[in-house]
Amino acid sequence: MVLTDGQGFRLRWSVSAIPDDFNLVSIQTVSPQTSAVYDMRQQQQLAFESGIDQDYTFEITIGHYQTFTLNLAPGWNLVSITGIPKTPEPAVIAADHPNLVLPFYSWDSTEYSYQPVTELVVGQGYWLLSTGPAITQLEIPLIQVNSYQRYISPGWSLVGGLTQPIDFTDTASVSDQPIGDPSVRSILRNSLYNWQPNLYAYDRSSRLGPGKGYWVLSLNDCQLTVTADAVNMLSPAIALPST
């Protein structure tokens, strides 16, 4: 734990003593809660601004990246990832699959248009086109996370799932804190739709599934928080005591 008293600070580290067999060495801020996970082999420090009287608690995880597999049907697929990818660039992730057509696309709800994707982020939904005649298995090494937060603007947005099915109507797992007027409703819980590539049709859903992307409608600016049951998450990683 770091006690700041409103002062900024910089957290530095060295992982030279950790055996190379552990390809996952990550750090995450658990208080205040955030979904951001940082690869400690890729960077050696984090900086935090001053002016906020906030105590920080960090969790360090040592283990191995898990492989998450997307099963992609021929045609357009609406997908998401369940964690922080080792390599976020779609061009690198899809390099061994010539039948996957770049770019991937996300939806910009403020511009009302699709945008090409340069990095995959947990919590976002993406359109991906496969020209293969059968199911393509796209394997993505990543750090599993059990929650994410993201801003949702009014209108339709593309969101994603986590490592296990989540009841979208359960306010303990899915919260949509309004930004601005707290009396205004935000996300409509019955507006969750996923895409069925085999049927070429949308299907209304009440659950967020792993690897799937979904359309959802919000009436207001809000902060969406989605949380999975951490007890049921299976991971070969070892969480060290919080510091």
Regions found by a protein language model. Name each.
Residues M1-V25, V30-Q44, F48-T243:
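N-terminal exported-region signature
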